[in-house]
């Protein structure tokens, strides 16, 4: 689950709340099941740009392919040939989510196969540079012996319905699947099914026969998909022993408008104002049209926002404010109670913040090809049909928020809760940092490993970076004109009613205020705690680039780019962090993500910010000599020569 924090923490004494270090998430954990014990192993390798072997022969220019992702005699062929050369004995398939990003890098993803069956946690991503040659690549392919027996010949595996029952029983899922009612209906693909006749899940469960790389070998498994709201799970059930689960992935991480405008993080920072046509006009449409019609409510191409007091799965027919004149102005004050009395204002604020963030990210490169959230992709690549479902005042929980990120083409889902640590209780929709944090989970999951692969942040350190990226973007966006590198920021301070926020340390460039170092991740099992470390490093990066390039006008929404490069340090930091997500391998660690950010800057600015980036990471122990080991990391403050 990619929630903002732990709902259970707010029940603890305030002295404990000041320094939360462990997660007590809702959902599965309420049923006494710890799904974190089923995490995928972290086995990816990343070959950064300056370590790629020299390439001879012809190349093509990625920019010459334009927006056409269907052309095959180009970067896809180059990537395929590189895989063949690197791993000549491997069998694999091309994932269909390849694209050329707006930074000129072609991103191509492959999945390893055995006997025509996916090895589900094996990925090979190749990044093709502007010169048409391999820029960098990541690899988690299995290099051991492939089972000689083809399971499709003897068909010595269990029925998918039995696997569904196994997942339900082992994880204690709130799904009913009576044997006499459940039918496994074949869908496109080998041994791929959708279950009909179940109840309790938000959509029909699914199952696909796959191999899983585990403990140095391959295990044949049923990948069972169940969306139960607070958890949207991929459960890898042994294909011969349905009482055994090998691994679990959770997709969930949580006109005219009167709103707190962009840059105002919460009601303590400013007042609500009326904004006229706030969308960024360089984009193709406004927020209330999707190519099929206009919606005089909080619905459009990028998002659909509504209240959800029951916490149920339905959303299309839920209440949302309507205005034939597109005037969304509704009363709200911090003293109003109960939250339902200002639901119109809450839904409008959530719709506004999410749409602005969508537009900013679009300019920075998170567009249709990269797997963004839109119903209509306007023939610009990617898969449409996937706006963000935004639930205001969701009744399925309190003191939290989460975001579910299925693969491209399926809607993301944000659940925003109320917070009861103050009187009156507070609505998380009015704290922009929470909304941005949650939406960023959708961004990092779509970019890492490619838009069609939403399990690439499922390892512990990868998931921690997911939380860190979310905190980083929320913090970078709330900067004020007078801020300097000595300015500190919290996360979730207003909603939680806690002056120090919901993280162990504030985001600060002071090692006294925030002493976090890379090796502090040793022994941590909470993704939020690990994320606090990663975001602390990115906060150093942010200020190093601002000190070099300036903040720009933080009162303006639109990033200013010149030749595709942001002109200010704030948006430049955001841009290279986004680009780094697309470059890094599936299931990355801190060292690999650092190298991908350096590579992103190398591609975007020819490495002109190399030293600023290295100094940010080295300051907090992720220097040249840093080494990842899950139980015992090696820290380093060393800088490369020339820095």
Swiss-Prot record:
Glycan attachment positions: 271, 420, 603, 629
CDD domains hit by this protein: M36
Record carries keyword Glycoprotein: yes
Compositionally biased residues, Low complexity: 61-73
Cofactor(s) listed: Zn(2+)
Residues binding Zn(2+): 437, 441
E.C. number: 3.4.24.-
Region annotated Disordered, chain positions: 47-73
Keywords: Glycoprotein, Hydrolase, Metal-binding, Metalloprotease, Protease, Secreted, Signal, Virulence, Zinc, Zymogen
GO MF annotation terms: metalloendopeptidase activity; zinc ion binding
Regions of compositional bias (Basic and acidic residues) in chain numbering: 47-57
Origin superkingdom: Eukaryota
Signal peptide start-end: 1-18
Compartments where located: Secreted
Family of the protein in this entry: Belongs to the peptidase M36 family.
Function: Secreted metalloproteinase probably acting as a virulence factor.
Protein name in UniProt: Extracellular metalloproteinase 4
Record organism: Trichophyton rubrum
Lineage: Eukaryota, Fungi, Dikarya, Ascomycota, Pezizomycotina
């Amino acid at each position: 689950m990619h929630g903002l924090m732990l709902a259970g923490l707010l029940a603890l004494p305030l002295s404990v709340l000041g320094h939360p270090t462990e997660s007590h998430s809702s959902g599965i954990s309420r049923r006494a099941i710890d799904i974190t014990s089923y995490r995928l192993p972290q086995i990816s390798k990343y070959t950064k740009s300056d370590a790629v072997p020299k390439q001879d022969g012809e190349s093509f220019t990625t920019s010459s392919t334009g927006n056409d992702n269907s052309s095959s005699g180009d970067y896809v062929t180059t990537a395929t040939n590189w895989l063949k050369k690197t791993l000549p004995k491997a069998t694999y398939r091309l994932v269909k989510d390849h694209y050329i990003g707006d930074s000129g890098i072609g991103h191509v993803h492959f999945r390893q196969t055995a006997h025509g069956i996916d090895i589900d946690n094996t990925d090979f991503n190749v990044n093709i540079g502007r010169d048409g040659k391999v820029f960098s690549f990541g690899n988690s392919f299995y290099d051991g012996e492939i089972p000689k027996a083809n399971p499709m010949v003897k068909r010595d595996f269990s029925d998918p319905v039995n696997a569904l029952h196994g997942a339900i029983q082992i994880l204690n899922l709130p799904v009913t699947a009576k044997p006499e009612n459940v039918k496994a209906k074949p869908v496109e693909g080998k041994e791929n099914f959708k279950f009909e006749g179940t109840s309790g899940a938000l959509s029909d469960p699914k199952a696909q026969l796959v191999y899983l790389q585990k403990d140095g070998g391959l295990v044949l498994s049923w990948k069972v998909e169940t969306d139960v709201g607070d958890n949207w799970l991929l459960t890898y059930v042994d294909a011969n022993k349905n009482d055994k689960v090998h691994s679990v992935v959770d997709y969930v991480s949580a006109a005219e408008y009167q709103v707190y405008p962009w840059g105002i993080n919460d009601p303590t920072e400013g007042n609500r104002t009326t904004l006229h046509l706030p969308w960024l006009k360089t984009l193709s449409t406004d927020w209330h049209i999707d190519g099929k019609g206009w919606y005089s409510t909080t619905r459009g191409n990028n998002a659909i926002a509504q209240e959800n007091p029951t916490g149920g799965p339905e959303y299309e027919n839920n209440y949302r404010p309507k205005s034939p004149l597109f005037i969304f102005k509704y009363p709200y004050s911090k003293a109003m109670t109960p939250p339902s009395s200002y639901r119109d204002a809450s839904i409008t604020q959530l719709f506004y913040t999410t749409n602005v963030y969508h537009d900013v990210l679009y300019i920075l490169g998170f567009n249709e090809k990269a797997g963004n959230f839109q119903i209509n992709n306007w023939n610009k690549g990617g898969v449409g049909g996937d706006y963000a479902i935004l639930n205001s005042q969701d009744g399925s929980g309190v003191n939290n928020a989460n975001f579910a990120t299925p693969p491209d083409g399926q809607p993301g889902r944000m659940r925003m809760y109320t917070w009861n640590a103050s009187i009156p209780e507070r609505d998380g929709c009015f704290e922009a940092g929470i909304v941005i944090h949650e939406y960023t989970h959708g961004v990092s999951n779509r970019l890492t490993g490619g838009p069609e692969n939403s399990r690439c942040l499922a390892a512990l350190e990868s998931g921690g970076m997911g939380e860190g990226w979310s905190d980083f973007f929320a913090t970078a966006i709330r900067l004020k004109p007078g801020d300097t590198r000595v300015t500190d920021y919290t996360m979730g301070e207003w909603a939680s009613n806690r002056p120090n926020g919901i993280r162990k340390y504030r985001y600060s460039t002071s090692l006294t205020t925030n002493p976090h170092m890379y090796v502090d991740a040793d022994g941590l099992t909470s993704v939020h705690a690990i994320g606090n470390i990663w975001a602390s490093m990115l906060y150093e990066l942010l200020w190093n680039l601002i000190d070099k390039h300036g903040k720009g006008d933080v009162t303006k929404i639109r990033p200013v780019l010149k030749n595709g490069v942001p002109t200010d340090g704030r948006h430049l930091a955001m841009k290279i962090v986004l680009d780094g997500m697309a470059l890094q391998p599936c299931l990355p660690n801190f060292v690999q993500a650092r190298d991908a950010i350096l590579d992103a800057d190398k591609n975007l600015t020819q490495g002109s910010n190399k030293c600023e980036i290295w100094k940010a990471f080295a300051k907090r122990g992720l220097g040249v000599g840093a080494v990842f080991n899950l139980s015992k990391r090696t820290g380093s403050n060393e800088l490369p020569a020339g820095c």
